[in-house]
Amino acid sequence: EPIRFPYHYRAPVNTGVDSGIDLDGDGKTGGPGDSWGFGRFPGQYGMLVLSRFPLADEKSRTFQNFRWSDMPDARRPTNPDGSPFHPDEVWNQLRLSSKSHWDVVFDIDGKDFHLLAHHPTPPVFDGPEDRNGARNFDEIRFWRDYTFPRPMEYMTDDRGVSGGLPADARFVIAGDFNADPHDGDSAAGAIDQLLDAPWIDASCTPLSEGGAEAAVKQGGVNARHAGDPAADTSDFNDRQVGNLRLDYLLPASSLDVIGCGVYWPAEDQPGNASIGFSDHRLVWLDIRL
C-alpha cells in the first residue's frame, strides 16, 4: 500500500521576486541576484509540504517578509575593510528568508503539531563580504530563536503577529539547510545552533550505506572530509565540493524518536536507480506521538 498525502501546504517565497534595488552590489537592478531571494522567476526553488494529516491553516504562519535587520545582533555582511556591504537604505529593506520560513500546523488527533520548514541560501556564490554565508547562518538561527523555550518577541509574521512557539509545542524543523556540521563552506557553527540546542533532539543522526559507498567510489574532495560520509544527504561535484550533510529533520526534545535514516541505497541495493532525480537524498524520521 502506498503512503498517500491528501493534504498540502504552499505559500509565496522570495526567490525570483524582484526587489527593485541593487542587492548584489553589481551596480545594476533587475537581475536574479537582486530578487529578495536569488531566482530568475517568482517561485523558483520554492517549497511544498505534503501531508497525511489535515492542516490547521488558520494557525499556520509565514515569515516571508521578515526583515533581516529586525533580528537582534544580525550578522550584517561587511566588506574586508569593515564597512557594511549594503548601504543602510538597502540593509533596512532586506528580507531574512531567501525562500521563506513556514510554521505549518497540523491537526493530529486533535492536537497541534508544527512543521517548521525553510530552505536557507547556499553559503557561497558571493564575495569576500560572505553575504550568503551570513544570511545562511541567520536563517538557521531564526528557528533556534523561534523554538527557544523562553519567548522571544522580535519575529513578526506576515500577518503582523509577533513571538515564537510556546515552550510545550510539538515540532520538527525540516528542510535543506545548506550547512554541514564538519565540511563545506557554511559559517562556523551555523548548523550547530540547532544541533547543540538542548530543547532540540539531534541524537538520531540519519545514515545510509549509499552515502558511505559513494564517498569512497567518487573520491576527490570526499577523501579530505571530516564528517561521516554515511550521514551525507547530497551528492555534489567531487572536485570542489564533495558530498555533504545538508538536509535535516530536527524534532523537539519532548518527542519520542524511534528511528531515522537517509534514503540512499548502495549500488547493489533495491531502489538505487531511483536516486538520480536529485542531487539531494530523502531524509526520514519516525516519531511516536
Predicted regions and their residues:
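Active-site catalytic loop in hydrolytic enzyme cores
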Residues: F63-D107
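Beta-strand-turn-beta hairpins that frame and shape the catalytic cleft
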Residues: R52-D57, L96-H119, L289
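Loop/turn elements at helix/coil->beta-strand transitions in domains of secreted/extracellular proteins
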Residues: P2-Y7, D109-H114, A167-R170, L255
